[in-house]
Amino acid sequence: MANKKSPAATWPVANGEYVLGNPESCVGVITLGSHGLDQAAVDAGAALSGPCHTENLGIEKVVANYISNPNIRFMIIAGSEVQGHITGQCIKALYENGIGDDGGIIGAKGAIPFMENIGKEPVERLQRQIIDCIDLIDVEDTAKIAAAIKNCTSQDPDAIDEEPMVVDLEGGEAVANTESTSMKPTSPEMALLEARMKIVSEKMNEAAMIAKFNSGYYNGKIQGIAIGLFLSILVFSLL
């Protein structure tokens, strides 16, 4: 029988729209932007399942909840990708590459993939603890998700040989086996607004470049006509 550890007393330490299962399960499921998949995932054997909409605070909550339960060793990313945020790809990039000194997720393609409240230590703990990240992004077939969960539970490798790590999401500090955690107020709506502002800015820059090109083309054309007229007058004056 697999060796298990008790998760943090307040697990899951970060609030969210989660459905909880057996805390001794070795599988956690992230359903990204989809709805109606979480209960089926838990019924199939997941420790918890819930959505993740944003590539910053949303992912921070995932990290906090996973590393505070040493039993979770597999992470399944399923459900529809969140447009603009590209949260699923950002989670994979975090697991595979970690974060830079500026808190940015290395290789992430989302709009604002920065860990403001999570430092390198919790991210590295997640990378040690999770032995496999299963990519089912854009899969909403509950049978396929359930099959992936059962495949993971059949390979249960025991809990990681470390104590639960609880992260203060406001201070970014990691504490082993403590109970307190706090949130910095951020909303998915604000992150979406920032993402849209970034897109608008990029479109404005593209429009400015096109206008600059067109302006240069038009000015060059006028100059060419003027030079042609001057040369024509000069030639006729010499005849």
Swiss-Prot record:
> What species was this sequence derived from?
Methanococcus maripaludis (strain C7 / ATCC BAA-1331)
Task: Identify the residue ranges that face the Extracellular compartment according to the record.
Answer: 239
The GO terms describing molecular function are: cobalt ion binding; tetrahydromethanopterin S-methyltransferase activity
Superkingdom of the source species? Archaea
Q: Name one Pfam family in it.
A: MtrA
Name its cellular compartments. Cell membrane
Q: Which family does it belong to?
A: Belongs to the MtrA family.
Topological category with respect to the lipid bilayer: Single-pass membrane protein
What are the annotated GO cellular component locations? plasma membrane
Top enzyme class, one word, equals translocase
| Predominant localisation class | membrane
Pathway involvement?
One-carbon metabolism; methanogenesis from CO(2); methyl-coenzyme M from 5,10-methylene-5,6,7,8-tetrahydromethanopterin: step 2/2
Q: What is the protein named? A: Tetrahydromethanopterin S-methyltransferase subunit A
